[in-house]
């Protein structure tokens, strides 16, 4: 029944995309693997091991009996993801390149490439599900809540989702690895990739300062007193604890006379100052009201004022209850039942109705 349906699988050389290809092959689809080369190996600070990952993908393809091709999307990734990421950092924001990559590359230029290859659908190893809700294709919560990637996929349109498959949506990560081992896939025990692809194992600030100018400035305490110097605002994000480069201040020791850790509370781009506080739940780190702009609504309509929804302000955060205070096509304001820690400008606020993802936008204000 599926023999005439051609599926192009985005293969990364990891266990998730490999098992995705295997499952679809077993289901009788005409499967072709396509490895995306999104980053130029050797670009300043780059640590993306493209060649190794491509070889792993081809080994899996040979084992399960599918062709695996490679395609260069370096220019598109640079223009639509990396440059946008850098511009956001310059403005004092903390953009998420994975969200941009899914919207602009994997489910856009990759999808178009797959169509040119005669594909009926594309498939990836994301942990998510697709459902029909109010005549639209929407993201649904996967079986493995700990791996739920709908946060990264929230900017996809119903049209994009109509051409996509997520075969791992009904599996746990443990089950995926068990399937890989049972079929002797060479990547069955390969570690999951973490962090931002193009940064690799480097420290964030070491990589970023190769691409953006870091201008040192004053570090302030909550009262506005200068207590140190920062390396450049592009090197920090809200809630950050490590790498601030400031020890304890006399008079702020804890009961056992050890210095309390510092946390980044805010960045002032205009004055080039970094405000830090002590106490992981300091009031300056907590917010109940969050505004997001540049909204993408999967249902093509905003929720209503007063709607009770669930939301995430970062990946892997447990979904939090909130109430819609204001909403239109471009903007939404929600008030959380409980204060949220380290809400960050430029990150995404993603909203859910039950298990369905309604969409999201870039955080533009919080208090």
Swiss-Prot record:
Known EC number:
2.8.1.13
Q: Where in the cell is it found?
A: Cytoplasm
Report the source organism: Aliarcobacter butzleri (strain RM4018) (Arcobacter butzleri)
* Intrachain disulfide bonds: 101-197
Residue segments, region Interaction with target base in tRNA: 96-98
Main location class = cytoplasm
A GO cellular component annotation in the UniProt record: cytoplasm
Residue ranges crossing the lipid bilayer per the database entry: none
Question: Which residues participate directly in catalysis?
Answer: 101, 197
Domain of life from the UniProt record: Bacteria
Q: Where does ATP bind?
A: 10-17, 36, 125
Q: In Gene Ontology terms, what is one molecular function of this protein?
A: tRNA-uridine 2-sulfurtransferase activity
**Which reaction is recorded as catalysed by this protein?**
S-sulfanyl-L-cysteinyl-[protein] + uridine(34) in tRNA + AH2 + ATP = 2-thiouridine(34) in tRNA + L-cysteinyl-[protein] + A + AMP + diphosphate + H(+)
One Pfam family for this entry, by name? tRNA_Me_trans_M
Return the protein name: tRNA-specific 2-thiouridylase MnmA 2
Chain's gene name: mnmA2
């Amino acid at each position: 029944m599926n023999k005439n349906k051609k599926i192009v699988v985005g293969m990364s050389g990891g266990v998730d995309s490999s098992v995705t290809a295997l499952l679809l092959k077993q289901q009788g689809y005409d499967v072709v693997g396509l490895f995306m080369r999104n980053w130029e190996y050797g670009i300043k600070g780059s640590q993306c091991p493209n060649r190794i990952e491509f070889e792993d993908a081809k080994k899996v393809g040979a084992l399960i009996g599918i062709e695996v091709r490679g395609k260069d999307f370096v220019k598109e990734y640079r223009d639509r993801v990396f440059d946008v990421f850098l511009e956001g950092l310059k403005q004092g924001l903390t953009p998420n390149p994975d969200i941009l990559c899914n919207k602009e590359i994997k489910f856009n230029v990759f999808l178009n490439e797959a169509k040119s290859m005669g594909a009926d659908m594309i498939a990836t190893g994301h942990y998510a599900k697709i459902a029909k809700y109010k005549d639209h294709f929407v993201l649904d919560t996967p079986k493995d809540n700990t791996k739920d990637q709908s946060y990264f996929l929230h900017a996809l349109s119903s049209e994009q989702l109509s051409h996509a498959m997520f075969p791992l949506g009904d599996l746990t990560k443990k089950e995926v690895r068990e399937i890989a081992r049972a079929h002797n896939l060479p990547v069955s025990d390969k570690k999951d990739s973490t962090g931002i692809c193009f940064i690799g194992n480097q420290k964030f600030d070491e990589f970023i300062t190769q691409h953006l100018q870091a201008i040192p400035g004053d570090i302030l305490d909550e009262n506005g007193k200068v207590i140190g110097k920062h390396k450049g605002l592009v090197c920090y994000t809200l809630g950050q604890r490590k790498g601030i480069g400031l020890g304890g201040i006399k008079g702020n020791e804890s009961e056992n006379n050890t210095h309390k850790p510092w946390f980044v509370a805010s960045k002032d781009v205009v004055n080039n100052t970094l405000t830090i506080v002590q106490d992981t739940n300091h009031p300056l780190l907590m917010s109940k009201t969050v505004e997001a702009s540049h909204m993408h609504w999967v249902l093509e309509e905003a929720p209503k004022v007063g709607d009770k929804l669930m939301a995430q302000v970062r990946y892997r955060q447990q979904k939090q209850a909130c109430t819609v205070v204001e909403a239109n096509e471009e903007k939404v304001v929600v008030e959380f039942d409980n204060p949220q820690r380290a809400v960050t400008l430029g990150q995404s606020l993603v909203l859910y109705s039950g298990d369905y993802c309604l969409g999201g936008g870039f955080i533009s204000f919080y208090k």
